[in-house]
């Protein structure tokens, strides 16, 4: 890959997107993944794994704010948070903004991701790797949740698409393990693709999660980087009330948190659970 070259995403066979490349900062094929970071004049630094864009400097805040602040503020008193994946450090960055959180454990299958993101995506982690509450575990996510004796208040699965190394993080074995190691009142969330184009992912996740959680749904956010625009996040807990908090409660918790966000706010939080009819029909549920 050379300067000014065009990089094509390969997630979809019949359509997709491209990025002009100003400079390739890093590329290495590790045991688990083909990693590349390059600079784009509009989106800043772009990270891709196995031909699929994972994050860009320009809009990563949308994804990471919604993946963290929605479950943490819905919980209200989270002390221990588990992040599966998230090697770029941005999920850790957002979780660490919650002063009430006492321990943040991140399980990443590939140590190489963490090391090169420290160097090449410094704005993503913003020094969060040095937070004394942070503990890094290099392990497979499925193995960890099924072997650990620890319990967590919130689990965030910052997984790749269900192909390659990320496939196991969409299985019943993983969801069962997550349900097992959540404290009472705990919440599980996971990225679930762009449902307009990857609807089967949401349907499969809904079916599998429903085996272990009483309340399973999804929420959404508009993230330009991901082709199709509207990213879907899986939500699972044993208490439907956590998903149905009134706006006044969310506003109070947000104010108390001291957070200053660029995308998330209490109204976005409440509205994000309103799902399009085509997804409700596919899930065979009513709202």
Curated annotation (Swiss-Prot):
GO BP of this protein: spermidine biosynthetic process
Residues binding S-methyl-5'-thioadenosine: 33, 108, 140-141, 165
Cell compartments where the protein resides: Cytoplasm
Entry annotated with the keyword Lipid metabolism: no
GO cellular component terms, A-Z: cytosol
Active site: 158
CDD domains linked to this entry: AdoMet_MTases
Pathway membership, UniProt: Amine and polyamine biosynthesis; spermidine biosynthesis; spermidine from putrescine: step 1/1
UniProt-listed Enzyme Commission number(s): 2.5.1.16
Keywords: Cytoplasm, Polyamine biosynthesis, Spermidine biosynthesis, Transferase
Keyword Cytoplasm: yes
Function of the molecule: Catalyzes the irreversible transfer of a propylamine group from the amino donor S-adenosylmethioninamine (decarboxy-AdoMet) to putrescine (1,4-diaminobutane) to yield spermidine.
Family matches, as NCBIfam families: MFS_SpdSyn, PRK00811.1, speE
Family membership noted in the UniProt record: Belongs to the spermidine/spermine synthase family.
PANTHER family: SPERMIDINE SYNTHASE, SPERMIDINE/SPERMINE SYNTHASE
Subunit structure: Homodimer or homotetramer.
Protein name: Polyamine aminopropyltransferase
Gene name in the database record: speE
């Amino acid at each position: 890959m050379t300067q000014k070259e065009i990089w094509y995403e390969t997630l979809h066979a019949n359509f997709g997107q491209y990025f002009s490349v100003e400079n390739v900062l890093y590329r290495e094929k590790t045991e688990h993944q083909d990693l590349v970071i390059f600079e784009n004049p509009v989106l800043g630094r772009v990270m891709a794994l196995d031909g699929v864009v994972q994050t860009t400097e320009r809009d990563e805040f949308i994804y990471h704010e919604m993946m963290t602040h929605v479950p943490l503020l819905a919980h209200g008193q989270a002390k221990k948070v588990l992040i599966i994946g998230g090697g770029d450090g941005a999920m850790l960055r957002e979780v660490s903004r919650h002063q009430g959180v006492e321990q943040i454990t991140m399980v990443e299958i590939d140590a190489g991701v963490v090391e090169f993101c420290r160097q090449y995506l410094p704005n993503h982690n913003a020094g969060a790797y040095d937070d004394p509450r942070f503990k890094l575990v290099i392990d497979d996510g499925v193995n960890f949740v099924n072997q650990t004796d620890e319990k967590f208040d919130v689990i965030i699965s910052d997984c790749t698409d269900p192909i390659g190394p990320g496939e196991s993080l969409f299985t019943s074995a993983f969801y069962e393990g997550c349900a097992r190691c959540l404290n009472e009142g705990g919440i599980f969330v996971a990225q679930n693709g762009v449902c307009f184009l990857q609807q089967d992912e949401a349907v499969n996740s809904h079916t599998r999660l429903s085996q272990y959680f009483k309340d399973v749904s999804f929420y959404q956010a508009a993230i330009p980087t991901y082709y199709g625009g509207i990213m879907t996040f899986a939500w699972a807990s044993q208490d439907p009330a956590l998903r149905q908090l009134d706006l006044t409660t969310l506003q109070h918790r947000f104010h108390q948190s001291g957070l200053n966000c660029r995308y998330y706010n209490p109204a976005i939080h409440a509205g994000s659970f309103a799902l399009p009819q085509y997804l409700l029909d596919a899930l065979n549920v009513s709202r």
